[in-house]
A protein has these predicted regions:
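Hydrophobic, gly/ala-rich membrane-insertion helices/peptides used by toxins and envelope proteins
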Residues: 1-23
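Hydrophobic/aromatic-lined pockets within catalytic cores
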Residues: 5, 58, 171
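N-terminal "domain-start" segment
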Residues: 15-145
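Active-site or metal-binding loop neighborhoods of secreted/extracellular toxin and effector enzymes
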Residues: 130-172
Length: 172
């Protein structure tokens, strides 16, 4: 009789952790912070926007924000376990509750939308640039554009027209 059969039908904590790891692990390549340092075609982005998008950050008030890609190791942002949604559309966009440096995001119900795991950081920068090239004003400094692979991306610009943040929209 194994040890786990005595747990009254519950998945033991150890097995839950492994099961969770398998759900989050994918067949897609993981990247690291060095890969972010080597991104090309970033002229349309502010200095801080790429870390906001790819790593998550804390604003001046200490509030968590950003984090729209989960395939880079060593970032300050992370998905809160058990909150990752199934794909919201054919492109592979999903959403999840996030935290940055252990501080849960509060804006947007604590959720971020995520670029598909199968895309590389460079492919995401390129997709944002494609959306930037055909974006239309939503209101204020918020715009919406579409990448060549069909991802609708919301873009927020600063007063100089540089990208502060960009994230996939949940549109089907």
């Amino acid at each position: 009789l194994d040890v786990y059969s005595k747990v009254k039908g519950k998945i033991p904590f150890f097995n839950r952790k492994i099961e969770s790891w398998y759900q989050n692990a994918s067949e897609f390549k993981m990247y690291n912070l060095d890969d972010l340092a080597n991104l090309e075609h970033t002229e349309n982005f502010t200095e801080k926007s790429l870390s906001h998008i790819f790593e998550g950050d804390l604003n001046k008030k200490g509030r968590a924000g950003g984090y729209h890609y989960d395939m880079i190791e060593g970032t300050s942002g992370s998905i809160i376990e058990g909150t990752k949604s199934p794909a919201l559309n054919d492109a592979g966009i999903y959403e999840a509750k996030v935290e940055v440096n252990g501080i849960p995001k509060k804006a947007n119900g604590g959720k971020s939308t995520f670029f598909p795991d199968h895309m590389s950081p460079q492919e995401i920068v390129d997709a944002i640039n494609e959306a930037y090239s055909n974006m239309e004003l939503i209101e204020g400094s918020r715009y919406s554009g579409t990448s060549q692979n069909g991802i609708d991306i919301e873009i927020i610009l600063n007063s100089e027209g540089k990208i502060i943040t960009a994230y996939p929209q949940k549109i089907e």
